[in-house]
């Protein structure tokens, strides 16, 4: 027997994400208090694995939104190319990530399954930026680029 993917498109997950943040306007630090992720992965072959895959995608998205950035000097050399200088989210910084599911089986995959987890890498940064800007709206400011570092928040507030 043989199998070919020709004519069978990739089937991606759909999701909705949101979070509650606390922005310290004195330090610029953002703490994610709670995060919600609802994904439609179609048929879940291993539901526990899917839950943790979604959480992993959200954590990766948190890293992109708040921490991860390649910094180069004027000669083009990477200046933060080690784990001491390249920031990633740590376990103690992780919020409670609440995962839920909407299930619509895909008619384009044999088992009705779709992707699982990748939505967090794209959805989480948007949800985080929206939550931070919502927290700052009464101060008539916003941040417009990621990662959303304390320095960027303080600059948006006119404090540095």
Feature roles, as predicted:
Residues 1-160:
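Cofactor-binding beta-sheet edge motifs in enzyme active sites
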């Amino acid at each position: 027997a043989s199998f070919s993917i020709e004519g069978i498109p990739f089937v991606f997950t759909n999701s909705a994400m949101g979070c509650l943040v606390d922005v310290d306007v004195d330090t610029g630090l953002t703490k994610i208090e709670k995060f919600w992720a609802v994904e439609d992965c179609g048929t879940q072959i291993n539901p526990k694995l899917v839950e943790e895959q979604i959480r992993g995608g959200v954590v990766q998205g948190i890293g992109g939104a708040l921490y991860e950035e390649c910094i180069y000097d004027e000669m083009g050399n990477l200046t933060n190319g080690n784990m001491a200088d390249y920031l990633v989210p740590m376990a103690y910084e992780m919020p409670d990530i609440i995962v839920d599911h909407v299930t619509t089986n895909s008619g384009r995959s044999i088992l009705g399954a779709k992707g699982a987890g990748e939505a967090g890498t794209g959805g989480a940064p948007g949800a985080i930026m929206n939550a931070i800007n919502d927290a700052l709206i009464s101060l008539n400011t916003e941040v417009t680029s990621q990662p959303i570092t304390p320095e960027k928040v303080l600059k948006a507030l006119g404090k540095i």
